[in-house]
Amino acid sequence: MSGHSKWATIKRKKAVTDQKRGSLFTKLVKEITIAAKMGGGDPSGNPRLRLAIDTARSNSMPMDNIQRAVKKGTGELEGVIYDEITYEGYGPAGIALIIETATDNRNRTVADLRHIMSRNNGSLGESGSVSWMFQRKGSLEVPVSAASEEALMEALLEAGLEDLSNDGGETYTVITDVRDLEAAKKALEEQAIAFENAKMDLIPENYIELEAEDARKVIKLIDALEENDDVQAVYSNMEISESAMNSLED
């Protein structure tokens, strides 16, 4: 999972910029609204909504905003109806991309994505063209200061732990089956071990390792996609080499 951890490091740094763009709250509101629409407005009985609310709160979204988003999802307040659509394609150096969107206008979204991809040496593919390369997993991150690797293993062994990795950075990356993410969160809470960025993730079966030049191109494309208000998440099978990581962090 080393590639996942390295890319996670880049994404954590990008998140600060994303929030400044004002796009983060838009994406979080959409996720809360969709989760409430699909599974009801009670987070205790709706794991997706509970996760969305936890993510919003960890990013300092006011409770009023969260509650309005929930009520729009349940129909208590009038709101936009979003469709969830997943697109697949390729970026520079043959990197596989999965783009999850929430949109009120499918034609606008696909036109925007085609434009972004074509301007950044990428292309959209057919449904199923790259999704077979990925598996849906639960993931979360634990600061290395919060627990030792041994303590994490012990806490999570009976809570669905599938993979635990650290690339020498400031966090451990924990991977679980999607059905075990809540159990993993609960296990860490019971041991008073701090964690962050708990989410459903798409993990590639295999990675393509890139050097700095190609990695920059892929990151530029992913940045452009994530700036689009309809895009909720972008996943890739990019792994960044050690030398490229050092170059990108300079």
From Swiss-Prot:
Matching Gene3D superfamilies: 1.10.10.200, 3.30.70.980
Subcellular location: Cytoplasm
Protein name (database record): Probable transcriptional regulatory protein Plut_1643
Predominant localisation class: cytoplasm
UniProt similarity note: Belongs to the TACO1 family.
Listed SUPFAM superfamilies: YebC-like
UniProt keyword Cytoplasm present: yes
GO CC annotation: cytosol
Signal peptide bounds: none
InterPro entries on file: Integrase-like_N, TACO1_YebC-like_2nd/3rd_dom, TACO1_YebC_N, Transcrip_reg_TACO1-like, Transcrip_reg_TACO1-like_dom3, YebC-like
Domain of life (superkingdom): Bacteria
GO process annotations (BP): regulation of DNA-templated transcription
Swiss-Prot/TrEMBL keywords: Cytoplasm, DNA-binding, Transcription, Transcription regulation
GO molecular function, one term: DNA binding
Keyword Transcription regulation: yes
Source organism: Chlorobium luteolum (strain DSM 273 / BCRC 81028 / 2530)
A Pfam family recorded for this sequence: TACO1_YebC_N
